[in-house]
Amino acid sequence: MPVAIRTLEVGGRQALTSSAFREFQQDRLAFLKRCAETADVVHVRLGAEDVLVISRPELATEVMLTRRADFSKAYLTSIMPPLLAGSLLLADSDSWLHQRKLMLPAFHKERLDTYAAMMAEESERAITTWQSGQRRDLHSDMMRLTLQIVTRTLFGLDFSHGVEATERLIDALMDEVNSRIASPFRFRYPMPSLRTLRLYRAMRELDEIAYTAIRERRRHPQDDLMSMLVGATDEDGTPMTDREVRDACLAVFFAGHETTSCLLSWTWYVLAGREDIERKLLAELNGAATLSAPPAELIERLPYTQNVLNEALRLYPPAYAFGRRAMRDTRVGDHEVKAGQTVVLSPWAMHRDARFWEEPEKFNPDRWQNNLAARLPKFTFFPFSSGPRRCVGSSFAMLEATIAIATILPRFKLSSPPAVVEPAPSITLRPGGGMPMTVTRRETLN
């Protein structure tokens, strides 16, 4: 059966380019969801981009797997500042494969075994300053926690002195990328502005920390990811430059810190006020008895915790959209894709599509019983992408989130005000305005 193709309509009529783009600028998530509700493939002009929004799993599989050689990350490169150009986040083909091979050993099962204890220690340390009845921004807390975990486990650093510099960098990066996504124009090197100057000033702060650590690893290697990269060579024996090591570390640093902090923040949000789900979680966590078990065994002991995290990822995927650009004329299903067109796949929209999910807007961890994740067709649920491009650190992120939940929830009850927290899409899906919550210490670990 041919795939439905149509240009997005606004107000019952075919949209002008400016109308569709204005809707995209005003509410990116609603726009993506309406595309999914309109057709399997929606063809729309968004400023400088000729875009196909694809909202069917088998077509997404073609783009990301079977025809992946026809597509590149050029769209992502066009909205990212050049300072990230060499990182795994933006790399294609040989460069991406080379970096991925270098990083894989840092995420092997044996490594995760050593990381788990550090994750638990950092989670314990993160809540030492919490006071019962205190109002806190949980997103800020989770950002600091995941920052400490990533820098300690993967880079062997106590990064407490670099927290503020990192927060300034990520906030500036989010502002810059948001501006580029919302712009009808594409300039690889845009005119300087206060926003771009703030970004590069923040990057210089973090670079000073990064290059100092790289030089130290060259003199005194340790058993961490940075030392692995410093000691790595290509096929002819040439070592990575400091810039290449910095780029590779930055990709892991950003993805491991930013995405997991968003996952944890949204998990606390969907749990707030759900006494029934909280009771089930606490019963499971108390029954598990210890976080010292090997990660694979720990995950196996906490199936309901995994269900809760998967459901939070379904409703609030940190990576809410993936963009690919056609490098040559190709096809997706029955539709021709021209070289230069951008294809967008949206976990946000497809995770909430009533064709694939029962009561898609409802937070229901029980839907994940009986190993639903393994039974779903590819690209029905893809918070970490899928196939060869699946996030190299996805197991790390899920272990990190599991241990944080298992450490914090038995000690503190988290409640949020009745106001709805709106998601703010930029590079990731952050909570707009933070995640204000009241933390109340539990009298016993019930």
Positions of PLM-derived features:
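Conserved cytochrome P450 K-helix E-x-x-R motif and the immediately C-terminal K′/meander segment
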Residues: S19-A39, E208, T212, L291-G333
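Cytochrome P450 heme-thiolate monooxygenase catalytic core
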Residues: M1-L8, F31, S72-S78, S95, ...
